[in-house]
């Protein structure tokens, strides 16, 4: 039986996402011919290049095409010229030499940045963004029926997916899909329809729907009752916890012509569990627009060990809140070793927060085994994050830790239920210095506008981050704005946080609207109106503001901060973006500084 | 002007065309935001900034609000729109005069009854800044079908689309139609909120002589083209009166002065008699004459876009 794991059109691919443990066992099961295909890689290749204009013009009559092209010309939009340049840039994203200097990276991204802007200016069906991929304008992504209805459309998005799947043979008996966002859900629905049209007998299963803040787990019963998603997918695996056991069982049931239908759990498949074949085979690195294969994976299927933050919806994906056991970490390391041998150079551990003790164990074991890998992780700042621990982590190949600092206001931390006894702003600053001393990079996330937070508190946090990160290398940050999600403590008790008139959640997880109590609303309005200025101030403090004015700069900054490209840079000893306050003046239009002087300064 | 090679030029013969996503989306959204801002914060409205609308009411014919767009939209944005429209019109239609637009607002009850603008221009343009998601209905531009609506349908039951084309006022859509076509605007119904209404910028497009780009000057071109037109008029003087409307040619002239090709960019010539079949032959004759022209030698190639009007002047004296 031929089984395809299809990577869906979505965010700009710079890393490979681990499909899960099920892959390793199914891949070595002789009954199945398992393969994967990145439709996403092909989709971006279709979008960023000359096929884009063809797809846009295809449905028009020759006269309409002539008139549309005349409109581009009248608007000074050189669609074909920019497409050629952008397609070249896309290829150069895979070339290691692109990442040698600020200048070469910015030069590479400039035409890509320009073309992405053009894609969003010359058509109004969807907005394309490197973070999410295509986002259809004016579509209600919180409603599964809206998505199912739209998935029948024959617009530009549909045609671009058609163009991206032409290389996928229509011979698979089973197609497995994973989604990470509502946008992915739409492309999954559209892709599923196309697979079905090519081969009506194919079984299409949505096997995973949990990533970061997104998960269908909280609304799975509503979705089951609405019969929307299962009108397109044959099966949907309800629980992410059970995915790795359910996928092999599902394949076995399909092979035995006893395929279940609809939302399924492991217990719905009556076949007895077979022992998985011995050994396993790693998920082969999918093509990406990065020069190195990076695997986005996890150490365990455990929730964050803290699991208390009142704003956090990430816990909805998994059931078990305990920190991973010693044996689990060792098993994960065995798997990572196999994946490193299969060609992955870097590992991004996306567990919401690994405890200091888990990290300590993981790092020690890497060092003991003499494994040479580069890795990054996420953690929650604790007193146990000592200089010694940071040294050990760096020694084992860790190059970056993400910390959700959120705010330095103790009052707001208490409201967030994220207070750590004995850990104040001074301790946090000391931890940052210790990380820098150990040679570790850091990505710091903040939340502004938590209900009740004042503008002054946000400014204090931003000033603190500006001061402390300015002295560090390889430090990036995200100043997020508070969003209300249903499946969170604050979403369950909005009144206790001064929230009212909370928007009715749809059946697809997403942020909810709300109103603040009058006593809090004015300050919150002021804070929101100041946010663009505060962001600019933080960028200025840390030397990132000027880069926005350089062609390619906005995209370069974004990919450096939030994609696998950042890992490529940060894992090097000579990262040209290590600290923009210390590096040479960035090249800007009209800046007489020559490229050679910039390179020399670096 | 970057004109397409003649072999790929399609002749526009339809009575109307639509160009979706006419402006870059950000440019269109900026203009719409100016409109939204104008209507926002109603407490701060002042006579000098907000008493700007002309309620154009002609009993039985027209009921809508109109103004000059720069009273709501930042002037440089309106200028940009006009510049783009002029360039587009020159490239796509071969007509380079575009009248300054009105900005019109249709709220509930507003409409335009059927009429034509035969005395106003060659083509009308309607550029929509209406929201795609709105709480009103109606506001479509209606353009009657060509031909004899009675005789063409005597044996066939027909309704709306059988008699006219209804064009939705989609955001950032440009509609251009033959000014001689009977047209109107479907009555808008629903909310009285102006932001839910139909906003369009509209005006007329006319010919204003040849458009010349390349090595030859306008003067060099005009005198040679005139030869062909005089020759054609001499041969077809009596029959020219049987036809009405614009035809636009695009000539590609080599450095040697020879015409490399002559394409028909637009042909909206209509016979007074619906049964007349003579125009295609006359058009071929005119194309042949233009193709045979010999222009002065020049340092490079030249593209000439030449409108020719059949029939008597469409314009009122002094217009």
Kindly give the residue locations of the regions a language model identified:
Chain A
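Conserved SAM/AdoMet-binding glycine-rich loop
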Residues: 3-8, 201-203, 330-442, 448-453, ...
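Acidic, low-complexity intrinsically disordered segments
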Residues: 4-24, 30, 39-333
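C-terminal accessory regions of radical SAM enzymes
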Residues: 6, 10, 14, 22, ...
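Flexible loop/turn segments at secondary-structure boundaries
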Residues: 11-15, 43-44, 183-186, 212-215, ...
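Short secondary-structure boundary/capping segments
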Residues: 19-22, 51-52, 191-192, 219-224, ...
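A structural motif corresponding to the C-terminal end of an alpha-helix
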Residues: 30-32, 168, 172, 232, ...
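Short acidic/polar active-site loop segments enriched in Thr and Asp
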Residues: 173, 310, 345, 399, ...
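Structural recognition of alpha->loop->beta junctions
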Residues: 219-248, 392-401, 460-484
